[in-house]
Amino acid sequence: MEECLLHGRLHATIYEVDHLHAEGGRSGFLGSILANVEETIGVGKGETQLYATIDLEKARVGRTRKITKEPKNPKWFESFHIYCGHMAKHVIFTVKDANPIGATLIGRGYIPVEDILHGEEVDRWVDILDNEKNPIAGGSKIHVKLQYFGVEKDKNWNRGIKSAKFPGVPYTFFSQRRGCKVSLYQDAHIPGNFVPKIPLAGGKNYEPHRCWEDIFDAITNAKHLIYITGWSVYTEISLVRDSRRPKQGGDVTVGELLKKKASEGVKVILLVWDDRTSVDLLKKDGLMATHDEETENFFRGTDVNCILCPRNPDDGGSIVQNLQISTMFTHHQKIVVVDSEMPSGGSRSRRIVSFVGGLDLCDGRYDTPFHSLFRTLDTAHHDDFHQPNFTGAAITKGGPREPWHDIHCRLEGPIAWDVLYNFEQRWSRQGGKDILVKMRELGDIIIPPSPVLFSEDHDVWNVQLFRSIDGGAAAGFPDSPEAAAEAGLVSGKDNIIDRSIQDAYIHAIRRAKDFIYIENQYFLGSSFAWSADGIKPEEINALHLIPKELSLKIVSKIKAGEKFKVYVVVPMWPEGIPESGSVQAILDWQKRTMEMMYKDVIKALRENGLEGEDPRDYLTFFCLGNREVKKDGEYEPSEKPEPDTDYIRAQEARRFMIYVHTKMMIVDDEYIIIGSANINQRSMDGARDSEIAMGGYQPYHLSTRQPARGQIHGFRMSLWYEHLGMLDETFLDPSSQECIQKVNRVADKYWDLYSSESLEHDLPGHLLRYPIGIASEGNITELPGCEFFPDTKARILGVKSDYMPPILTT
């Protein structure tokens, strides 16, 4: 039997196993020893802990809770809603007995994919087989039910958002909210001379917003509460730095501002990730420097409540899993929640306003769309010099600093309360003291969740909140799998997981009609479909579907003869010393991900008579960089970098990457996702890094009969103006061949200028071709002359790590 593609949704129920004999599990001498050891060292239960999993070949897609004290007839009665995009011969149900370290295999049941391919419901008792495919002792069977729904049966497949009645992403913890308002931010600040003229519907022009100024105003004007979560919060930075836009009190640091607000009686609470090991393996590569202990010390003994919050595991994992979670994973949500004046003013009532996205309130984040390397070193960046990619980099040795490109948003209306509730859930689980503002007691001042714009207002938004988080980090999750499923949560091996960010991405990609534009700090995943080139793909476990969904979407459009384009912007390399083991390992995973996608695209082009077409006309990858000529009056450092280092080479060549830290996807100019979640397994898993994101659209600006021309379109055009240094008519339709070829041509030219021996003028734009080649079969190769990133000895295609576990770098 050949493998078949399962692309759609799988509804599965695992009921029970009948008359199980525990020979495969804990019986006999070994079982009694293990039980005694567990009781002696205080782990485990000294009894069977049976659970079942669902796999599509070697990709784990579902797992039940553990059942104790039922060694012969475990009953789970758990249902699963599974997004799939896998090649498989069988759906495999595995029964295991959990141990403190690892698990004992009982056996596996197999249902051929061809039995479910046409959508029939299959409800059967399946033989449980051992590794040799023989029935296990006693002839046990597992009772399961399966039904598959292919994407073509999805009423939203390829249809975009058809109307304002679109209900949002199904099976999620938070429902979609209407009557909201969203402000979109590119970078921490927009100076007054960044003014692209971008026409929108209704005769308006796009107007950019200023993120850190708005956050400064929101904190300054709060009267009752200021709640902040971050991967890092650094007390010594200032939010307002534009000398042409001074603000009263704007010269204060974040730390002093928060202390001042707390002393005025505002409840100021910070949940900052407690970098426990400060993950030594990564830290030596320059990947982590969060100031967590400095921040805690700064607020000690003040009115500000600052809690360092470790990424604690839920209770369901093995000892090894729990150790992995607490030492390897992070709290990555970046939110600010405040009470605010009413939009109309003149009222004593207050409302909730929230900020969500990729920007932490810490050093190295303040930047503008100009992303200067050298010219702000005596002004905005003199006291905020960030360059973790070179050993020993310092303002005294000069630039290039690492420019920072990021995306954030402000949420108003009912959606802002969902962000508040997320904070309350997290504080209740990990904050300790009961100090949250009691909203009921402020009921006469803070209005309950209500629309901030009327449904007739053409600027109105519908917005939904998504997360990656589990019961170890958020209180209030239901205990039973049935209640969890009803709340849009996934039950794992005794932990409850919110994985809705991944679901939101999958849903949006499947809906897409014309094009997708992604900016993300990482791009790796769907490892179940990687080539087994020096690895065992089943051991990588970067199983999230996003890269595979993108390539399957392109393939489906090629088959249908319809135009569809995907643009992806990533950093040149993940932040850190580029030659280091961790950075090189991540680049290797990224290469394997791109390769998997290009192989899909090239195969589809061949099968549809389009052999010889450039796959970059369908799927194209970019990075950002800058290069500046020296100007009179520039900051002169007092020292020099060490000779023959990346640092001195970059300084002399006057170039460096612009770090892409964004986590954003735009679909058809009508739908946008912005958050803290990267396109990697850490962010998309739900039980690894904690994340938050919004997905939203403007009901009056959909891509139905004509192209969408609302805020999302304006935002994309403004980003492209930032990256390409120009506006062009072809950019209005990213789905066209003319557009993708023009963008590729410009990015190729900019890469040639960036990587050339010398440059007589500033780089005219920042968008660079990602420096890889694509062979005829889709294999990723070196671009001629581009084995290493400029000024480094770091391989562009990365190197597989022999010592770093994939769970750390995926």
UniProtKB/Swiss-Prot annotation:
<feature type="active site">
    <location>
        <position position="668"/>
    </location>
</feature>
<dbReference type="GO" id="GO:0009941">
    <property type="term" value="C:chloroplast envelope"/>
</dbReference>
<feature type="binding site">
    <location>
        <position position="371"/>
    </location>
    <ligand>
        <name>Ca(2+)</name>
    </ligand>
</feature>
<feature type="active site">
    <location>
        <position position="663"/>
    </location>
</feature>
<keyword id="KW-0963">Cytoplasm</keyword>
<dbReference type="GO" id="GO:0005773">
    <property type="term" value="C:vacuole"/>
</dbReference>
<feature type="binding site">
    <location>
        <position position="405"/>
    </location>
    <ligand>
        <name>Ca(2+)</name>
    </ligand>
</feature>
<keyword id="KW-0106">Calcium</keyword>
<dbReference type="InterPro" id="IPR001736">
    <property type="entry name" value="PLipase_D/transphosphatidylase"/>
</dbReference>
<dbReference type="GO" id="GO:0009873">
    <property type="term" value="P:ethylene-activated signaling pathway"/>
</dbReference>
<keyword id="KW-0968">Cytoplasmic vesicle</keyword>
<feature type="active site">
    <location>
        <position position="334"/>
    </location>
</feature>
<feature type="binding site">
    <location>
        <position position="187"/>
    </location>
    <ligand>
        <name>Ca(2+)</name>
    </ligand>
</feature>
<feature type="binding site">
    <location>
        <position position="722"/>
    </location>
    <ligand>
        <name>Ca(2+)</name>
    </ligand>
</feature>
<keyword id="KW-0926">Vacuole</keyword>
<dbReference type="InterPro" id="IPR000008">
    <property type="entry name" value="C2_dom"/>
</dbReference>
<dbReference type="GO" id="GO:0005634">
    <property type="term" value="C:nucleus"/>
</dbReference>
<dbReference type="GO" id="GO:0005509">
    <property type="term" value="F:calcium ion binding"/>
</dbReference>
<feature type="domain" description="PLD phosphodiesterase 1">
    <location>
        <begin position="327"/>
        <end position="365"/>
    </location>
</feature>
<dbReference type="Pfam" id="PF12357">
    <property type="entry name" value="PLD_C"/>
</dbReference>
<dbReference type="Pfam" id="PF00614">
    <property type="entry name" value="PLDc"/>
</dbReference>
<protein>
    <recommendedName>
        <fullName>Phospholipase D alpha 2</fullName>
        <ecNumber>3.1.4.4</ecNumber>
    </recommendedName>
</protein>
<keyword id="KW-0938">Abscisic acid signaling pathway</keyword>
<keyword id="KW-0936">Ethylene signaling pathway</keyword>
<dbReference type="GO" id="GO:0030136">
    <property type="term" value="C:clathrin-coated vesicle"/>
</dbReference>
<comment type="function">
    <text>Hydrolyzes glycerol-phospholipids at the terminal phosphodiesteric bond to generate phosphatidic acids (PA). Plays an important role in various cellular processes, including phytohormone action and response to stress, characterized by acidification of the cell.</text>
</comment>
<dbReference type="InterPro" id="IPR035892">
    <property type="entry name" value="C2_domain_sf"/>
</dbReference>
<keyword id="KW-0442">Lipid degradation</keyword>
<feature type="active site">
    <location>
        <position position="661"/>
    </location>
</feature>
<keyword id="KW-0378">Hydrolase</keyword>
<keyword id="KW-0677">Repeat</keyword>
<keyword id="KW-0479">Metal-binding</keyword>
<dbReference type="GO" id="GO:0009738">
    <property type="term" value="P:abscisic acid-activated signaling pathway"/>
</dbReference>
<dbReference type="InterPro" id="IPR024632">
    <property type="entry name" value="PLipase_D_C"/>
</dbReference>
<keyword id="KW-0443">Lipid metabolism</keyword>
<dbReference type="GO" id="GO:0016042">
    <property type="term" value="P:lipid catabolic process"/>
</dbReference>
<dbReference type="InterPro" id="IPR011402">
    <property type="entry name" value="PLipase_D_pln"/>
</dbReference>
<feature type="domain" description="C2">
    <location>
        <begin position="1"/>
        <end position="126"/>
    </location>
</feature>
<dbReference type="GO" id="GO:0046470">
    <property type="term" value="P:phosphatidylcholine metabolic process"/>
</dbReference>
<dbReference type="GO" id="GO:0004630">
    <property type="term" value="F:phospholipase D activity"/>
</dbReference>
<feature type="binding site">
    <location>
        <position position="661"/>
    </location>
    <ligand>
        <name>a 1,2-diacyl-sn-glycero-3-phosphate</name>
    </ligand>
</feature>
<dbReference type="GO" id="GO:0016020">
    <property type="term" value="C:membrane"/>
</dbReference>
